[in-house]
């Protein structure tokens, strides 16, 4: 087992496609979008829609709906992929219940990017600790390198990403993940997280 816990493969799959995890994902996905027709319809029929989605995932008849490409201009111009609400519910369940824990387990403590309980405030506190330590050890005789990886997600290799998932998750979860990614992103490079 690649997760470092005692769950069986069926329990792991159920933690993604079972009614409760999908319903919980719907509750998270609905925030701020219930004014739109598709999310409102799904939410108003939440129990029925979630049972239907769970059954489709269980019996292999689930097919993601066509994605739409959307241009975003703020805070910086970029292209995003808009998924159908039910597809977002499934993807959120897959991410929150299996992928996120499996992938972040190996991150260094100082990685603050897109992690629960981390963010700008924690990063600033950690930077403050480092600066104080460097000042104690070196006075004013030290340098800081500030950098940003420009175009990281748009240039990310699909093959490399899939290999990383393959190393971290079981085969059924890997297949679920690659089906989502391949269905949503064309070509051999580029992702748009948060879409």
Predicted features and spans:
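Non-catalytic, polymerase-adjacent accessory regions of viral genome-replication enzymes
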Residues: 1-51
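Active-site-proximal segment of RNA-dependent polymerases
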Residues: 2-13, 95-154
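Non-catalytic, well-ordered alpha-helical scaffold segments
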Residues: 10, 20-23, 47, 51, ...
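Short, conserved non-catalytic motifs in the polymerase core
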Residues: 33-40, 65-92, 106-118, 181-195
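Active-site-flanking structural segment that lines cofactor/substrate pockets
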Residues: 47-77
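Conserved polymerase palm-domain catalytic core
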Residues: 56, 130, 134-195
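Generic hydrophobic/packing signal
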Residues: 57, 74, 98-102, 131, ...
């Amino acid at each position: 087992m690649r997760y470092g816990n005692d769950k069986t493969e069926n329990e792991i799959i159920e933690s993604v496609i079972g009614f409760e995890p999908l319903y919980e994902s719907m509750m998270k996905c609905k925030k701020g979008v219930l004014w739109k027709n598709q999310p409102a319809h799904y939410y108003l029929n939440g129990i029925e829609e979630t049972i239907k989605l769970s059954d489709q995932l269980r019996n292999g008849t689930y097919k993601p709906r066509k994605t739409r490409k959307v241009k975003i201009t703020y805070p910086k111009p970029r292209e995003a992929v808009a998924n159908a609400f039910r597809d977002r519910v499934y993807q959120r369940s897959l991410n929150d219940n299996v992928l996120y824990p499996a992938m972040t387990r190996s991150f260094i403590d100082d990685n603050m990017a897109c992690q629960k309980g981390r963010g700008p405030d924690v990063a600033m506190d950690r930077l403050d600790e480092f600066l104080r330590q460097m000042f104690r050890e070196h006075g004013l005789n030290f340098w800081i390198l500030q950098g940003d990886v420009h175009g990281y997600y748009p240039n990310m290799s699909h093959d490399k990403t899939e290999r990383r998932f393959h190393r971290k998750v079981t085969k059924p979860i890997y297949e679920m993940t690659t089906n989502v990614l391949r269905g949503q992103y064309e070509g051999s490079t580029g992702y748009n997280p948060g879409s």
